[in-house]
């Protein structure tokens, strides 16, 4: 089951172990959903609203629809490929800056009742969006991308006389490249990200994409 992916985000402190003085204990919940393509998803989500607000900011990368449209226009203008993908369990790629404890519930099977320390950016924690953003921003910089000034969640780099772009919406990516497959393979092989639904853009951020008979890319934002 997919919820087992989150179990590696905890440090087991043993049954009945007390949390340090001044720390709160929270619960986590298993949330089940069905994706637009029929895939089933289970996610372990923490009661982060019960924790204190982090001293640094909370942030998630959320490209605007306007920025996405401009990026797609540039792709068509320069005859570049337009791909999209979803990074599986993205938050769990980053470590959390918060120190949060929880008491394991029945979903943890034989560890029910144990005290667990969360050390990964679990969904629901206040700082998880920022930690994932920082993690993936480091990845893009390492590959040679820089954030654009007017749309910081669109990243760009010059390659062979053309500009390539990556639009980030939390863990959903749209990218415009001469060779999109190579970029996806770098994310998988070098950085070990788990990509899902990778390929020519057809559905992204609630929008359907298709090409007319003359090859024109059309965007229908009826679900945005």
Predicted regions and their residues:
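Long, low-complexity, charge-biased intrinsically disordered regions
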Residues: 1-224
